[in-house]
Amino acid sequence: HYLLSICYSVSASLAESWDLLATDSGFARWFPQLNIVGNTLVFEMEGFREVMDLLEYRKNEKIAYRWDSAIVSFTLSQLENQTLITFEERIPEDFGNEFANAQKDMTGWLVQNECIKKFLEGQEPPVRQPLQEKWRTFLELELEGL
């Protein structure tokens, strides 16, 4: 499998970061296709619906969930007046569905994390297309020799 790991700090509080990353009102801002329903996460887009297991949900600490056959997590920790966010995706090499393969999926999460950082720093969300190009190119080079 592949492991995509991204670590960054934001000037937002732990509570603000958690609210954005792990609540329905937060998802509405950066990933409106997601909703928490009981102990599952529901992804709905253009007639497609997938119910994914919520694997961990520790308030202000960690959210982890199945993402198709991958596992995605956000872990939060306090750093003085900042919050450290660690994103991880463990993704099988044969990951794939009608929308994405492993590379496209990782590109999407790299873009999402840039957007999350901007939201938490009170900035306008970036235009996604140039970010997709940047990260797609980066991953092509990274995965080339594997």
Language-model segments: what does each one mean?
Residues K118-L146:
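Short, highly charged C-terminal tails/helix-capping segments
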Residues L3-C7, T40, R49, K62, ...:
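Intrinsic-disorder/low-complexity, polar/charged segments enriched in Ser/Thr/Lys/Arg/Asp/Glu/Gln
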